[in-house]
Regions:
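Residues within the helices of the helix-turn-helix
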Residues: 4-5, 19, 126, 140
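Non-catalytic alpha-helical scaffold/packing segments enriched in small hydrophobic residues
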Residues: 127, 137-141, 170
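Major-groove DNA-recognition helix of helix-turn-helix-type DNA-binding domains
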Residues: 16-34, 135-156
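Internal active-site segments that recognize and position negatively charged phosphoryl groups
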Residues: 130-134
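Aromatic-anchored, glycine/proline-accented short structural segments
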Residues: 142-176
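Arg/Lys-rich, alpha-helical DNA-contact motif
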Residues: 2-11, 23-24, 28-34, 38-124, ...
Length: 238
């Protein structure tokens, strides 16, 4: 049996976190002594370890955070078999997201080594959006965020050539893999230096970036999340 302070020290969280986890249903209801002090069991310790391990992953996009929370809720209901199954699904999902992230990097590498395009075809924003199966608003947003600089005609209308189409294709691939706007902006500003390491650039925020999110280190964050999912499965096997 454990007191709140003792079990918090074992897991490495603040005692208030333990109380909040009970309130939110992340662990089973905790019995009280006559003096109203909480008394925790090994089941509570196990549930806290699961929550602590999974919540170290800060990625919120692509349903990842919700899947982790569902595992913790299920474990809190003492449905350990189901929680283990959900963890397997979560691990599979993380591995797919990781593959998507690496595939997007390949798209960038292929783009870099492609021969210059001499095609003279030109598109409006609406046409290029339809071509790439994205919305005109997405294209406008990427322009607004400085991911692409689009030339204008004399009348002020933007016109997209094959060079812009290829760059938009790269941006779309990276965004679909959940890379942040900051990461893509950083990549496109450094892409033409000799032998760029695409993954390193995408995962290395600069000192000039005011806000750094976990998706600015997407590949590394996914690797850490996969490690956490494997650690959680190991807890279920004990």
């Amino acid at each position: 049996m454990y007191k709140t302070k003792e079990i918090a020290q074992i897991v490495g969280v603040h005692p208030n976190t333990v109380r909040i986890y009970e309130e939110w249903g992340f662990i089973s209801p905790v019995p009280r002594k006559n003096n109203w002090y909480r008394v925790y069991s090994d089941i509570h310790l196990f549930q806290l370890k699961v929550a602590r391990t999974l919540f170290q992953c800060e990625i919120v996009q692509g349903n990842i955070r919700k899947m982790a929370r569902d595992i913790v809720y299920t474990c809190g209901k003492e449905q350990f078999g189901k929680a283990e199954e959900l963890t397997q699904d979560y691990l599979s999902h993380l591995k797919k997201e990781y593959e998507y992230a690496l595939v997007a990097v390949k798209v960038v590498e292929n783009w870099l080594h492609k021969n210059p395009i001499n095609d003279v075809r030109q598109y409006t924003r609406k046409e290029v959006a339809r071509l790439l199966d994205i919305t005109p608003e997405a294209v406008r947003n990427w322009e607004r965020n400085g991911l692409i600089d689009v030339p204008r005609l004399e009348n002020g209308f933007r016109i997209y050539g094959e060079k812009e189409v290829e760059q938009l294709r790269v941006i779309r691939s990276l965004r679909s893999a959940h890379y942040s706007i900051n990461s893509i902006h950083r990549l496109l500003s450094q892409i033409h230096r000799p032998s760029p390491n695409i993954i390193e650039i995408l995962n290395s925020p600069t000192e000039n970036e005011d806000i750094v999110t976990v998706t600015d280190r997407l590949v590394k964050s996914l690797e850490e999340a996969i490690e956490g999912a494997n650690e959680t499965l190991a807890l279920f096997k004990k």
